[in-house]
Structure formats: C-alpha cells, structure tokens
C-alpha cells in the first residue's frame, strides 16, 4: 500500500469551525505623540587639530639685529 492510499483510507476530519467574522474595527484616531523632548545639544565640537609638529618646531621670527655699523652721515 502506498502512503497516499493509506491517507485516503483515513476518515475525513470535519472542517474546523471558523469563528464568525468580525468587521474590522475602524482605526482609532491617531493620538498626538508626547510633546517632542527638547532637542539634545550636539556634542561639543572636537578641539581643532593641533598644527603639524613641523610648525611647532619653527622658532619665532625675530627682527634682524640692528646694524652695528655706523653709517656716515648723508651729505645733503
């Protein structure tokens, strides 16, 4: 006997009793959400990158030393 034939010999089961169909309930009115929370302050900006190291090594520019040589007075 094949599997299908065995299935055929089993007594039929009564169809399940479906519950009576309910009309779908109308959608409830959308409720206003809670008031918006105050906007979060953005994270503080990250510190700007330090200047590249080669800029830090430069000595500050100094004015040239005053001339030691005494110039002769200009003739008019």
Swiss-Prot record:
Name of the protein this chain belongs to: Small proline-rich protein 2E
Subcellular location field: Cytoplasm
Segments for region (Disordered): 52-76
InterPro entries xref list: SPRR2
Physiological role: Cross-linked envelope protein of keratinocytes. It is a keratinocyte protein that first appears in the cell cytosol, but ultimately becomes cross-linked to membrane proteins by transglutaminase. All that results in the formation of an insoluble envelope beneath the plasma membrane.
Keyword Nucleotide-binding in record: no
Organism: Mus musculus
Tissue: Expressed in uterus.
């Amino acid at each position: 006997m094949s599997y299908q034939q065995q299935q055929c010999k089993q007594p039929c089961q009564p169809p399940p009793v479906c519950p009576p169909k309910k009309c779908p309930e109308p959608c409830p009115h959308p409720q206003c959400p809670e008031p918006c929370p105050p906007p979060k302050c953005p994270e503080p900006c990250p510190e700007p990158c330090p200047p590249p190291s080669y800029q830090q090594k430069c000595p500050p520019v100094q004015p040239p030393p005053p001339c030691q040589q005494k110039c002769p007075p200009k003739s008019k």
